[in-house]
Amino acid sequence: MAECRASGGGSGGDSLDKSITLPPDEIFRNLENAKRFAIDIGGSLTKLAYYSTVQHKVAKVRSFDHPGKDAEQDHEPPYEISVQEEITARLHFIKFENTYMEACLDFIRDHLVNTETKVIQATGGGAYKFKDLIEEKLRLKVDKEDVMTCLIKGCNFVLKNIPHEAFMYQKDSDPEFRFQTNHPNIFPYLLVNIGSGVSIVKVETEDRFEWIGGSSIGGGTFWGLGALLTKTKKFDELLQLASRGRHANVDMLVQDIYGGAHQTLGLSGNLIASSFGKSATADREFSKEDMAKSLLHMISNDIGQLACLYAKLHGLDRVYFGGFFIRGHPVTMRTITYSINFFSKGEVQALFLRHEGYLGAIGAFLKGAEQDNPNQYSWGENYAASSGLMSTAPELCPTQRARSGTFDLLEMDRLERPLVNLPLLLDPSSYVPDTVDLTDDALARQYWLTCFEEALDGVVKRAVASQPESVDAAERAEKFRQKYWGKLQTLRHQPFAYGTLTVRSLLDTREHCLNEFNFPDPYSKVKQKENGLALKCFQSVTRSLDSLGWEERQLALVKGLLAGNVFDWGAKAVSDVLESDPQFGFEEAKRKLQERPWLVDSYTKWLQRLKGPPHKCALIFADNSGIDIILGVFPFVRELLCRGIEVILACNSGPALNDVTYSESLIVAERIAAMDPIICTALREDRLLLVQTGSSPPCLDLSRLDKGLAVLVRERGADLVVIEGMGRAVHTNYHALLRCESLKLAVVKNAWLAERLGGQLFSVIFKYEVPAE
């Protein structure tokens, strides 16, 4: 393991950073491939940003090149699978104390091998202080960037790219953190940066912002006066004192002046009438804790009132707070929130950011990378490699680390394609993908965390089995187990660590951890086999459907969709059956389905709609490979095509569980077209279009879809959206409101969830919705 020692005057010192307990080669990951650097040096903390390329394995599928063979007769799979190396881009952000600046620069210099850059962008007050040291150690020219410009660019970046970035802090609520959904238009807003002093900036667009005010009374005031009053020199220790203090012992309250008469003034007796008002007349010593608390209230109330006045003056209702004074400290966030609520009478929101400590570093990086146009891409937080928002409770997490900021590590992956809202969302600004917020529902949270823990052995076993020729598969799988288990324990004690905790985020985190240890598609061979078997049955299924009368066929098609959706390897109730009974197939799945009336049953309403004029274009979000896509979805697609309806079939861009991927759907469609003239003609005439969603998870976020898909939806005038599967239609989007008609259908394959919804295992949800006029 590489070591990194603090150095002072050339001699060794303590370990890298008390706040980072990971070994240096895990902190400075992919440093050897770093292409561009930026650094934000504050009064006590340094934030380093660098862009690197990451090489990892991806599973690729390719159709066999012998079309003359009869796919139904031969016993070979429908396509071949290969694992290839792929290079992607990643942003790394690291926070460490300035004490260890020289040691970290030495480590970076010793491990830089492939960098082409000759410049490092620098911002923050320390950019001047450490300029010569950085240039000497890294042999890179320091380009100093404007602090405020960097902060604004960084703030815009995280608000656009990271879901649940902003939150309100409500101390007496459960949960304390209320995360905001991503708003499609983040402008305008007020940014209040509380460093040594206070800067207040109105941000109107990506490039237009204006410094509109500020104050000399800020974090430096709290630190300086606090040190004089308490003899405590460390900022974090001062805040700890404040958290234990009672300000009413030092402050003069309204009730101290007016007694019971304060009610006639319409004021609360507990309001502060005079900060430190009792200290002039009291004949006793005050505790350090009480003085620190009084000082914190005085400064926070002043900043809150100032921010509120500027927000009102400029007609703004969103105020984001950042700077070293905040840094995720609950006592600070609580006092600022109270102040904003009081002075604005609840009309202005005080919002904080999960990554506010990195805004300057992100902005400096973006300034240096303008020629690469990083804003043309979408970026996603990598949960496997990032630290979480720190606990406000006593430290319970297995990974012990002292508080020195909101984050220790942050990594963001560049996504292949830009992501946008589905144009058919009724109101993108109020859209919430997830049905249940597990940070808000303690019972559901404990159940799902336990559920994912108990499933871990099976995931590890499947990962190892997917790479039988790899000599280190078992070792990597064990590392995956340890990392994901650690994430689950963190989330047990800090459910807000990565924003709103949901089933979707638990699944995403698991996929990120699998990819981290080069298990890109553990179910690739399962999907290959099931696709091959289902293709052999396709013609018999369509012949059976064609023999039915119209009304009988519509119900059979829906039951086929539902039966296909049973085949979900992510559901333990199903995977147990599939592993114990290899003969379990399409007909057996139909018999598992709940009899009508279903748990949610809009089928009669749907049938009545089918008797009317046909839709123009249907957008279908498919779920699983094998029987689901081939015997459930494609016959349904075929029926829509026969009605003259165009179809856009959207599948995941990358693998997760046994969900069908876009590349697999292309091969499946090609094989089906060779057997079915309706599908063949529709593909040739572009009436059936296969597209990728732009994402990989088993759930579906309609606010982050491939831009090409959104363009196609507009061009084709889609007026029906079909979402199938538990992940896409129950865990997410169950309450999603669209501008057009929608079908949400799934089989509930989890007994606990089914009971909670008022049903039983294999209950059916068939939800047909028409938008209100």
UniProtKB/Swiss-Prot annotation:
Activity is strongly promoted by Co(2+), Ni(2+), Mg(2+) and Mn(2+). Activity is inhibited by EDTA. A motif (Subfamily II EGMGR motif) lies at residues 724-728. The modification 3'-nitrotyrosine is found at residue 320. Residues 403-773 are annotated as: 4'-phosphopantetheine phosphatase. GO terms for molecular function: ATP binding; metal ion binding; pantothenate kinase activity; phosphatase activity. Acetyl-CoA binds at residues 196, 199. Its EC number is 3.1.3.-. The modification Phosphoserine is found at residue 404. Its main location: cytoplasm. Mn(2+) binds at residues 623-624, 659. Pfam families: ARMT1-like_dom, Fumble. Residues 2-402 are annotated as: Pantothenate kinase. Induction: By glucose. It catalyses: (R)-4'-phosphopantetheine + H2O = (R)-pantetheine + phosphate; (R)-4'-phosphopantetheine sulfonate + H2O = (R)-pantetheine sulfonate + phosphate; (R)-4'-phospho-S-sulfopantetheine + H2O = (R)-S-sulfopantetheine + phosphate. The modification Phosphothreonine is found at residue 406. Its cofactor is Mn(2+); Ni(2+). It is an enzyme of class 3 (hydrolase). Keywords: Acetylation, ATP-binding, Coenzyme A biosynthesis, Cytoplasm, Hydrolase, Manganese, Metal-binding, Nickel, Nitration, Nucleotide-binding, Phosphoprotein. Phosphatase which shows a preference for 4'-phosphopantetheine and its oxidatively damaged forms (sulfonate or S-sulfonate), providing strong indirect evidence that the phosphatase activity pre-empts damage in the coenzyme A (CoA) pathway. Hydrolyzing excess 4'-phosphopantetheine could constitute a directed overflow mechanism to prevent its oxidation to the S-sulfonate, sulfonate, or other forms. Hydrolyzing 4'-phosphopantetheine sulfonate or S-sulfonate would forestall their conversion to inactive forms of CoA and acyl carrier protein. PANTHER family: 4'-PHOSPHOPANTETHEINE PHOSPHATASE, PANTOTHENATE KINASE. Homodimer. Interacts with PKM. This is 4'-phosphopantetheine phosphatase. It comes from Rattus norvegicus (Rat). The lineage of its organism: Eukaryota, Metazoa, Chordata, Craniata, Vertebrata.
